[in-house]
């Protein structure tokens, strides 16, 4: 469980496809069913979003999914229970994407206990600055759950080194300045940014934010170790276009042979 399980997703040159699903969008049974589908389809890791009323890093698609989940009365406790149930059936690592407020409102210790029971392997907290990560990092380290760092295009290399020096799991490299969402293409400087991050950190580097097509996936995994696909996966699940998710997974895995 935990850090080692995430590490295994990248071993021997594997390229990781990491889909994002919003916890409770469509109900908790739907969450479990979607995780089972993604596991069977060959996803490497699944990222589960915790719905929050003020999601500052999320684009419109993920915001709408979070609102649907909150409007349906889904709770953090309910999401943990659903994950604990589906964990018995799937092997891929679970990574939670949560803002800090739900963690503090739930109680840090209680949150981590529930993570353990649900088989959570890593956590991303997009609004937790590096300078404040001791709020939760030592508690996670004690139980072998990875606190996964986010680095951005605007981060100086010294800061990237600092942020990632004590991190575990993988580095989430944000490929755009702004919120999540589908984009048409990536600028040339994104390539040099990802190459720079790769050359300065000792963890796998995963690109995320704005990745939505097979071409995007192929472009990104040529440079880094995997991709997170969020808004597009939510859209495809909502519209029952699951074969297109399988195509994105296939595009990722194809690059392992290269």
Curated annotation (Swiss-Prot):
EC top class named in words: lyase
Reactions mediated catalytically: (1S,2R)-1-C-(indol-3-yl)glycerol 3-phosphate + L-serine = D-glyceraldehyde 3-phosphate + L-tryptophan + H2O
Residues annotated as the enzyme's active site: 47 (proton acceptor), 58 (proton acceptor)
Pathway terms, separated by semicolons: Amino-acid biosynthesis; L-tryptophan biosynthesis; L-tryptophan from chorismate: step 5/5
Molecular function terms, GO-annotated: tryptophan synthase activity
Name recorded for this polypeptide: Tryptophan synthase alpha chain
SUBUNIT field: Tetramer of two alpha and two beta chains.
SUPFAM superfamilies, per database record: Ribulose-phoshate binding barrel
Lineage, opening ranks: Bacteria, Bacillati, Bacillota, Bacilli, Bacillales
Disulfide bond residue pairs: none
Gene: trpA
Keyword set, alphabetical order: Amino-acid biosynthesis, Aromatic amino acid biosynthesis, Lyase, Tryptophan biosynthesis
Pfam families: Trp_syntA
């Amino acid at each position: 469980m935990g850090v080692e399980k995430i590490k295994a997703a990248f071993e021997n040159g594997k390229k990781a496809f990491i889909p994002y699903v919003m916890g409770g969008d469509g109900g908790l049974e739907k969450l479990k069913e979607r995780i089972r589908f993604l596991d069977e389809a060959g996803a490497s890791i699944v990222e589960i979003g915790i719905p929050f009323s003020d999601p500052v890093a999320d684009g419109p698609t993920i915001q709408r999914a979070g609102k649907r989940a909150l409007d349906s009365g889904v709770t953090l406790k309910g999401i943990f229970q659903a994950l604990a149930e589906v964990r018995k059936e799937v092997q891929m690592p679970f990574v939670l994407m949560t803002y800090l407020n739900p963690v503090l409102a739930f109680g840090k210790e209680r949150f981590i206990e529930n993570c353990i029971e649900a088989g959570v392997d890593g956590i991303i907290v997009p609004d937790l600055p590096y300078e404040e990560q001791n709020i939760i990092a030592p508690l996670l380290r004690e139980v072998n759950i990875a606190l996964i760092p986010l680095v951005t295009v605007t981060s100086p290399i010294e800061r990237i080194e600092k942020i990632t020096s004590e991190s575990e799991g993988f580095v989430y490299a944000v490929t755009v300045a702004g919120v999540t969402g589908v984009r048409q293409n990536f600028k040339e400087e994104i390539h040099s940014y990802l190459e720079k991050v790769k050359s300065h950190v000792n963890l796998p580097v995963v690109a995320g934010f704005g990745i939505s097509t097979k071409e995007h996936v192929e472009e990104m995994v040529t440079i880094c170790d995997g991709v997170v696909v969020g808004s597009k996966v939510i859209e495809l699940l909502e519209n029952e276009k699951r074969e297109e998710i399988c195509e994105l997974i296939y595009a990722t895995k194809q690059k392992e042979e290269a």
